[in-house]
Amino acid sequence: MHKKLYISDVTLRDGMHAIRHQYSIQNVQDIARALDEAKVDSIEVAHGDGLQGSSFNYGFGAHSDLEWIEAVAEVVKHAQIATLLLPGIGTIHDLKAAYDAGARVVRVATHCTEADISKQHIEYARSLGMDTVGFLMMSHMTTPDHLAIEAKKMESYGATCVYVVDSGGAMNMHDIRARFRALKAALRPETQTGMHAHHNLSLGVANSIAAVEEGCDRIDASLAGMGAGAGNAPLEVFIAAAERLGWHHGTDLYRLLDAADDIVRPLQDRPVRVDRETLALGYAGVYSSFLRHAEIAAKKYGLKAVDILVELGKRRMVGGQEDMIVDVALDLKRREARA
């Protein structure tokens, strides 16, 4: 394969979920510096739930998005700074502030059937001259053909790249291939595609490889898999696999290995791995960032987190419905009392 893959690191955004959005300024600078020296193309920086995600519903961050972005801007020389915006949480005013702080790439994220709410934000990002990406979350919850229709909407608003986002880590390689084939058939040849995997079924790297084989241009990954649930595709593992396949990625594998083990892994207060709870996310198709919230609810109400997660999957809950986790826990508690 001759084209260079665009390597998009998400350790400082999706990785926020793994430590409940508590990175210090020193942490983000250490991680960003290591990623920059390893020559990744972009480094995404924000609260785990995007600009202005810091809240009662999602959890308060140790710092503001702008403090984190400005801190990263001080140390990077090669990589572009990316950020995430969920319409309804972040606004175009927040996007402008992020741009002023140093962000040059924005991923505008919606549920996979709600691309129409991204129009204002994508158009505004393009007017700022940002690298503007559409991000279709929970892509397993709709058909490949419908996902392509939603991707086409984002393209029409001005997105120059659209992502298949496996937020629940619920898809396999066949699911990924079907979605990329549908997107490639619907989108203009010049519109790029990207893959954002989660590792809940241990398929994060395999799914990313399948995506590239179907023509995907950009791959999201994180150091040591640092991310929601069982984490994202581990960056150093994907790069090692890409190297074995002879793919052009432009990054320094050994620097990534050192950063993953020496800087990122020691920060994990809960191991980022496939275990009973994170496997339940992938099996039940649940939004990966529900994990820590469900574990807190389970402890509070004397339940098993896995039972809460499976019930959330049955109810087809999506990102943004974190408040329903307590509702589900109370329902399960009532059921238990009646039994």
UniProtKB/Swiss-Prot annotation:
InterPro entries: 2-IPM_HCS-like, 4OH_2_O-val_aldolase, Aldolase_TIM, DmpG_comm, DRE_TIM_HOA, PYR_CT. Mn(2+) binds at residues 14, 196, 198. It comes from the Bacteria. It is an enzyme of class 4 (lyase). Keywords: Aromatic hydrocarbons catabolism, Lyase, Manganese, Metal-binding. The record marks 13 as: Transition state stabilizer. GO terms for biological process: catabolic process; L-leucine biosynthetic process. Its EC number is 4.1.3.39. GO terms for molecular function: 2-isopropylmalate synthase activity; 4-hydroxy-2-oxovalerate aldolase activity; manganese ion binding. It catalyses: (S)-4-hydroxy-2-oxopentanoate = acetaldehyde + pyruvate. CDD domains: DRE_TIM_HOA. Substrate binds at residues 13-14, 167, 196, 287. Residues 5-257 form the Pyruvate carboxyltransferase domain. HAMAP family: HOA. Belongs to the 4-hydroxy-2-oxovalerate aldolase family. This is 4-hydroxy-2-oxovalerate aldolase 1. It comes from Burkholderia vietnamiensis (strain G4 / LMG 22486) (Burkholderia cepacia (strain R1808)).
